[in-house]
């Protein structure tokens, strides 16, 4: 018996006929069988199953067939196939339903009919008790079916597949996710469809983002289709990142595809598979990218993609661009370059003009002006690279290149000649008349450099017009004040410092908060201060030395005694010699007192002396009126204290200025002082130089004009000013300077200010000692040609110091010093040669004057001529400043004496000058006496030897002429006339006989030597 099947598997038949012996013949694959074959197979099957087959004499009924259960199963399958192609009633478009039905039918047919490569073709039933021969019937059926269906083929070779264990696969996943997270890479999860994910930074942390459809311009109801395995893999990858809670308000444009794990967002939101993928927001609620929404919601909701950001930027940009487009363009605008290149050029210009990390970053908006206006080399280098990029890669944008070039040129317009601006302020800063005010205004405008505006240029042009009209109209008026009515009391009220009254700059204890200023103040502490270790004691810091002397600090009082008597002794301090108020204590301009630049007095006009200033630790003490203010220093080490280096105590003034500087300007302020101001000032500068530095800082940082200064003590004996720090002063009796703010200190800058104190050093050299030593050196070198030559080579202007005494000038003229100077300086340095000629002419006139008063008047007449030659000095050295100081004093003394004489007053300074001349002459005569003594000794030794030779060579009795010559020579040599007792030894032998003495007694060698020694 044989049976043909369309989709029946051989295994089913094997189960049915499990106990029988079968012979199976492979047949063709039924996947490609057509409908006719299937129909014929069905009819054959039904004929076998429903009709009894007669084999010989016996009938075989349906119940007797061994494959009756198989018939029932095949019948049900055939019934299903019969109705397989029928169309179901569905809603929707006809064409779409038809296409879907055809596709589904093909899939189900292929799934139904596709079986294994072999089916049962022939079944052999062994003989039973009923001997039935079914061979013929089965062969007929098989022959009819195999003509179309039988196709023999070799069975496929099964390939063995190797599978990784679950633990190894997990390790591979873990390593892959670690690499993706560290390198911010893109990962693709592939199943039936691929899902892409990327890693990027979001709100300060690294997060996982999935690629969704709306990011590529597609608006679908389901933004991300993902199967379960991909969701599990994506969740496993998301677990590698920190599960931080995300603020709902921070989810905006650019957060599309953000994968949030359950717990990182509010519990009220919907999750699936333990995570939430951001799509956008609809009616204030976030939408998951995997959720299915309606078409209306899909097109009305706000998607949080980066493309939305670009649209939000470009659409307003395009709208405003068209709105501001200029009228009257002479040509028709066409697209000549691509929009992409225009965007690239716009990005280059943005980074060149306003460098930032994001155009929406507010912090970049605040810091960018400082970067653009600054002069950092990194900023200029970056802008130069961008300009080179424009030239090389974008030559079709010449307007962008020209714009950036002009910007860099404008930025490089910086005025570096600070000395000229300061000199202008020193020369005419105190004059309030035209044209001096115009010159000062032009100087300040030019100092601005690249910060100039159009209004500044117009103002400068106006001032230059006024200068051109009034440049030659210079006048100077000076009046002498009287100290009898001078009063300069200090205020008992404390100065109001706005910087210390702002609550934002004070802590909970009311102390000043340095902020960024304290961080940048380290440039002062490290470079110009010395650390004090309290563990080592304070003894070595008590004596504060300077070149002129020393004073004692009160730092030793930090170690206090519990004995009240000892404490009372410490309060008294150690006083110096106290000086009264004099001209050295005042400052005048245009005949009026400049009170801030004068010493403080009491109500009766007497000087107010300093008392003991108590020490403190780690403080900056400011304020001169009322109670001082104590600010905590921004120390580097809480256990250390700091004291200014010797010669740099003026750094406490700059520390006080830093209090009023803005925090954003503190870095430039401290660097400018460290790199520019301090190298110019050096150690122990003059007060005028310190005031000039403060004036320069006030131009760049106007807030420092209101800054309070530390206390300043004046030591008139040593011509020194002491800027006090927190360690006070144990030495008392100094005068006190009244100035309290920076604007008052700047008054010392003006050259028209008449004050001795502006030349005082904030620490420094003793100028009086230096001047006296230079004069002594000049006197010593008059009769030492080698020493004079060395002085003329190293310090040529030292010869001007000779005008302090007419005797020194005459001695230098007689010794040939001026002639030696002329030979040395001609023709290379005509200025010095002219100066030597002037001094030589003055010395010639002094030799003709008999009276000392006449000699002084001649020197005063030549003082102005000498000063004019000194102003144009070609060498800068120490002797030049000393010479200018002495000549200036001569001129000032002459003018004051003249004013007194015109007023009817008697001038008593002549006696002082006579006494000074006698003092100098004593030293000069002592030097000359030593020189004469040496000359006499050398002369006497020479004549002694000559006379001894003559006494032996000639006979005095026979050679009378030679005797007379001998006596004449001795008389001239020893300057002793023969008629005197000293000349008795020179008389003739005849004279000695009359006196009763023999010639041997007179002219023996021994007696002659004694007489010669007596004459010497």
UniProtKB/Swiss-Prot annotation:
Changing residue 716 to S: No effect on proteolytic activity of HC-pro. It comes from the Viruses. Changing residue 735 to S: No effect on proteolytic activity of HC-pro. A motif (Involved in interaction with stylet and aphid transmission) lies at residues 358-361. Its EC number is 3.4.21.-, 3.4.22.45. The keyword Endoplasmic reticulum does not apply. Residues 997-1016 are annotated as: Disordered. Residues 641-763 form the Peptidase C6 domain. The record marks 304-305, 763-764 as: Cleavage. Keywords: Host cell junction, Host-virus interaction, Hydrolase, Inhibition of host innate immune response by virus, Protease, Serine protease, Suppressor of RNA silencing, Transport, Viral immunoevasion, Viral movement protein. Transmembrane segments: none annotated. This is P3N-PIPO polyprotein. It comes from Tobacco etch virus (TEV).
């Amino acid at each position: 018996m044989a049976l043909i099947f369309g989709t029946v598997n051989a295994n089913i038949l094997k189960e049915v006929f499990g106990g029988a012996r079968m012979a199976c013949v492979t047949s063709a694959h039924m996947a490609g069988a057509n409908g006719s074959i299937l129909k014929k197979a069905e009819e054959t099957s039904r004929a076998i199953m429903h009709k009894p087959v007669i084999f010989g004499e016996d009938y075989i009924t349906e119940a007797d067939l061994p494959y009756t259960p198989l018939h029932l199963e095949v019948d049900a399958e055939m019934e299903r196939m019969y109705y397989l192609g029928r169309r179901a009633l569905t809603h929707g478009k006809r064409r779409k339903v038809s296409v879907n039905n055809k596709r589904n039918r093909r899939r189900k047919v292929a799934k139904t009919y596709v079986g294994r490569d072999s089916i049962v073709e022939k079944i052999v039933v062994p003989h039973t008790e009923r001997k039935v021969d079914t061979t013929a019937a089965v062969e007929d059926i098989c022959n009819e079916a195999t003509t179309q269906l039988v196709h023999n083929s070799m069975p496929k070779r099964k390939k063995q597949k190797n599978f990784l264990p679950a633990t190894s696969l997990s390790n591979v996943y873990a390593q892959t996710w670690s690499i993706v997270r560290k390198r911010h890479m893109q990962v693709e999860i592939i199943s039936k469809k691929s899902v892409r994910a990327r890693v990027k930074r979001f709100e300060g942390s690294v997060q996982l983002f999935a690629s969704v459809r709306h990011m590529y311009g597609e608006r679908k109801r389901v933004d991300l289709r993902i199967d379960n395995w991909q969701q599990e893999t994506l969740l496993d990858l998301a677990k590698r990142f920190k599960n931080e809670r995300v603020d709902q308000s921070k989810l905006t444009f650019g957060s599309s595809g953000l994968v949030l794990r359950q717990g990182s967002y509010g519990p009220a939101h919907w999750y699936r598979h333990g995570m939430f993928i951001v799509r956008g927001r609809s009616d204030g609620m976030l939408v998951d990218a995997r959720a299915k929404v309606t078409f209306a919601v899909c097109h009305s909701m706000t998607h949080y993609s980066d493309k939305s950001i670009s649209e939000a930027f470009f659409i307003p940009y395009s709208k405003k661009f068209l709105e501001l487009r200029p009228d009257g363009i002479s040509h028709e605008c066409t697209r000549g370059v691509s929009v992409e290149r225009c965007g690239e050029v716009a990005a280059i210009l943005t980074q060149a003009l306003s460098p930032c990390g994001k155009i929406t970053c507010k912090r970049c908006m605040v810091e960018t002006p400082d970067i653009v206006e600054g002069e950092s080399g990194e900023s200029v280098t970056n802008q130069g690279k961008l300009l080179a990029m424009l030239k090389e890669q974008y030559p079709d944008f010449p307007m962008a290149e020209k714009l950036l070039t002009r910007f860099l040129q404008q930025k490089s317009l910086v005025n570096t000649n600070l000395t000229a601006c300061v000199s202008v302020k020193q020369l005419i800063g105190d004059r309030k008349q035209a044209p001096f005010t115009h010159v000062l205004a032009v100087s300040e405008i030019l100092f601005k450099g690249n910060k100039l505006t159009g209004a500044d240029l117009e103002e400068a042009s106006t001032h230059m017009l006024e200068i051109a009209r009034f440049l030659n109209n210079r006048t100077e008026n000076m009046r002498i004040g009287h100290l009898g009515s001078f009063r300069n009391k200090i205020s008992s009220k404390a100065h109001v410092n706005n910087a210390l009254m702002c609550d934002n700059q004070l802590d909970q204890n009311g102390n000043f908060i340095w902020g960024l200023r304290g961080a940048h103040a380290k440039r002062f502490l490290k470079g110009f201060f010395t650390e004090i270790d309290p563990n080592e004691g304070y003894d070595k810091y008590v004596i504060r030395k300077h070149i002129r002397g020393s004073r004692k600090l009160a730092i030793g009082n930090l170690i206090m005694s519990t004995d009240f008597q000892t404490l009372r002794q410490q309060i008294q301090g150690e006083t110096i010699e106290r000086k009264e108020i004099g001209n050295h204590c005042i400052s005048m301009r245009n005949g009026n007192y400049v009170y801030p630049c004068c010493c403080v007095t009491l109500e009766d006009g007497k000087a107010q002396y300093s008392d003991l200033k108590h020490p403190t630790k780690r403080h900056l003490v400011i304020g001169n009126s009322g109670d001082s203010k104590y600010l905590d220093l921004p120390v580097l080490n809480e256990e250390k204290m700091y004291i200014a280096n010797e010669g740099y105590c003026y750094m406490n003034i700059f520390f006080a200025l830093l209090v009023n500087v803005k925090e954003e300007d503190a870095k430039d302020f401290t660097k400018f002082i460290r790199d520019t101001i301090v190298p110019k000032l050096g150690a122990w500068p003059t007060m005028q130089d310190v005031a000039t530095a403060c004036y320069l800082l006030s131009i760049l940082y106007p807030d420092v004009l209101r800054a309070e200064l530390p206390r300043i003590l004046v030591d008139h004996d040593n011509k020194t000013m002491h800027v006090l720090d927190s360690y006070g002063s144990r030495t008392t009796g100094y005068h006190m300077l009244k100035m309290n703010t920076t604007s008052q200190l700047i008054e010392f800058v003006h050259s028209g200010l008449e004050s001795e104190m502006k030349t005082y050093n904030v620490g420094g050299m003793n100028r009086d000692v230096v001047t006296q030593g230079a004069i002594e050196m000049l006197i010593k070198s008059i009769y030492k040609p080698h020493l004079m030559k060395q002085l003329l080579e190293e310090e040529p202007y030292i010869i001007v110091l000779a005008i302090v005494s007419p005797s020194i000038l005459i001695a230098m003229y007689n010794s040939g010093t001026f002639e030696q100077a002329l030979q040395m300086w001609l023709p290379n340095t005509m200025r010095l040669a002219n100066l030597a000629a002037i001094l030589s002419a003055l010395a010639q006139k002094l030799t003709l004057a008999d009276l000392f008063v006449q000699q002084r008047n001649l020197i005063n007449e030549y003082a102005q001529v000498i000063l004019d030659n000194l102003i144009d000095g070609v060498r800068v050295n120490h002797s030049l400043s000393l010479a200018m100081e002495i000549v200036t004093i001569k001129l000032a003394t002459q003018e004051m004496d003249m004013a007194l004489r015109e007023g009817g007053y008697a001038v008593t300074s002549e006696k002082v000058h006579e006494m000074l001349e006698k003092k100098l002459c004593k030293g000069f005569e002592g030097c000359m006496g030593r020189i004469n003594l040496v000359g006499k000794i050398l002369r006497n030794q020479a004549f002694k030897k000559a006379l001894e030779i003559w006494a032996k060579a000639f006979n005095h009795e026979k050679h009378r002429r030679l005797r007379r010559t001998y006596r004449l020579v001795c008389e001239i040599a020893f300057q002793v006339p023969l008629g005197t007792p000293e000349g008795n030894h020179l008389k003739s032998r005849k004279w000695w006989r009359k006196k009763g003495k023999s010639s041997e007694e007179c002219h023996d060698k021994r007696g002659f030597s004694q007489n010669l020694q007596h004459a010497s």
